[in-house]
């Protein structure tokens, strides 16, 4: 009698599956909260809230690249069966210093930065913009620093823990928003920011504090700090340039679009972001797997995994776009009933193209980062940022939301779309 064999599911797929659930919860929270926040704040104040939440991505670099540097060291040391406690301890010291320096700097700069960023609103909102900007910045700095927890857990192939913490923090934030909607329906932008994002900032900090106690006895020397920082600088530069590329649309929106168009664009991007979050969850889980396969020189297996993920990602984006377009009236009515979401089919086609390009580009960017090969990114991403900024500014002036998407697609197509895969193949052949 033939024995039945249980199919062994790869660990990165188990982690990716938990990431999908986590990302769905997070994206769902962000979408559902739109309805409550619009009722609490009103259209113009919610547009300000939306632009402020765009700072979350900017302050993701509050970890100054230490998270990615630490993740790669953990993956490499795990492959060689060596301890990495000293690296975690050193990383916490560096991150604490980063938190203090950035928070102090923003205390003095918030008024000036907010006056440049939040220019298209009423005098009442602009008069309070400095405090809104500072509160948002502090919350997002804590979130950026705390994100190192997720890097550690993914490197240890315990990504499911990271996903639970992340999803739980956003669920708690959503419950806070619902509470102020019913208990304090006329709350300010500050209350809304703290309600939604304070749990997201606090939970990872609590976890990393306990983790620090666990590695407290590890011996750290100057070389440990030096090694972490030498790699982190590359990740910091790349992350900063990537953020400029991906967040230029928020800067352009703040200057070129009306409050109504800002809401249309950001809500639509949140809906599509739900799909893309699912793919980025796969990439996040694959990063340590790719790093270990590279150390073990298993290039054929690595290439096969990447090829299948790109094909699956593009197919998923296409299918998801069709689903959203068919049900768009129903979806938008649930998210924010009463807001005019008259969006042309061209926007949906452009979004499908844009996110398919992102699947391709982000996959190769992840591969190069897992190999610590960042020089090409330093060279090519500034060109992308320049092209993206100029084209989005110009096209948004003439075509509004469609113009921003034209600029995004052009910036990727003319630079990283071809540059990253060419460089990856060149480097992988040399290392093989």
From Swiss-Prot:
Single GO biological process annotation from the record: O antigen biosynthetic process
Coiled-coil residue windows: none
Bilayer disposition of the protein: Multi-pass membrane protein
InterPro entries assigned to the protein according to its UniProt record, in alphabetical order: Poly_Biosynth_Transport
Spans through the membrane: 14-34, 47-67, 90-110, 134-154, 164-184, 189-209, 234-254, 271-291, 305-325, 334-354, 376-396, 400-420
Highest taxon listed in the record's lineage: Bacteria
Chief localization: membrane
Record pathway: Bacterial outer membrane biogenesis; LPS O-antigen biosynthesis
Keyword Transport tagged: yes
Cellular compartments annotated: Cell inner membrane
Keywords linked to the UniProt accession: Cell inner membrane, Cell membrane, Lipopolysaccharide biosynthesis, Membrane, Transmembrane, Transmembrane helix, Transport
One GO CC term, this protein: plasma membrane
Record function comment: May be involved in the translocation process of the nascent O-polysaccharide molecules and/or its ligation to lipid A core units.
Name assigned to this protein: Putative O-antigen transporter
Organism: Salmonella typhi
Gene name as annotated: rfbX
